Design a protein with these regions (language model features):
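Residue-identity detector for glycine
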Residues: 2, 6, 27-30
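C-terminal region of N-terminal signal peptides and the immediate post-cleavage residues
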Residues: 18-34
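Intrinsically disordered, low-complexity sequence elements enriched in Ser/Thr/Gly/Pro
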Residues: 1-2, 15, 34-37
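Sec-dependent N-terminal signal peptides
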Residues: 3-18, 22
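Beta-strand-enriched cores of mature, soluble protein domains
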Residues: 29-158
Length: 158
């Protein structure tokens, strides 16, 4: 059970991709390169854990989750992610996530320390629609025992 809670906390943290900043429009061509930054509150409403191999923590164990992305209490998108345990010694999982907004999606991935409450960065690996060719990073403020939602600050580079 402790493993499941740690993995769920990591999932919510990764999901934690808050308020008052609108989702940016697509950059127009011909303008100088600039950074676009926005924040969302990430919630997890569906989650499933797959315990592979021997019962308990083992390489290849997975967690799959999804949920809405919010700004100012309003849903502005949704997320889906898969985390796979890649190191028992380092308590690491490889997470791959997609964040879907009106007009496009942003993909991201990172190695995450399972159960850690420390903030961390996630690499933006691409996008579609108005986020086509997206690059940059996401600063993650993980969920905690007192705040079940995480905060994601997207830093998109044109």
């Amino acid at each position: 059970m402790g493993k499941k809670l740690g993995v769920l906390a990591a999932a919510i943290a990764v999901a934690a991709l808050v308020v008052g900043v609108a989702i940016p429009a697509a950059g127009s061509s011909g303008q100088a390169s600039k950074d676009r930054t926005f924040r969302v509150t990430a919630t997890v409403t569906e989650v499933s854990q797959i315990d592979l191999g021997a019962p308990g923590p083992s390489l290849g164990d997975e967690i799959v989750f999804s949920g809405p992305l919010l700004q100012g209490g309003h849903q502005v998108g949704h997320q889906g992610a898969v985390g796979t345990t890649v190191s028992l010694q380092r308590h690491e999982a490889q997470f791959i996530a997609t964040y879907s907004f009106s007009g496009g999606q942003i993909t991201a991935q990172a190695l995450v320390i399972l159960g850690s409450a420390a903030p961390y960065e996630v690499a933006i690996t691409g996008g579609t629609g108005k986020y086509e060719g997206a690059k940059g990073e996401i600063d993650v403020l993980p969920a905690t025992a007192t705040n079940p939602n995480g905060i994601l600050t997207f830093h998109l580079q044109d």
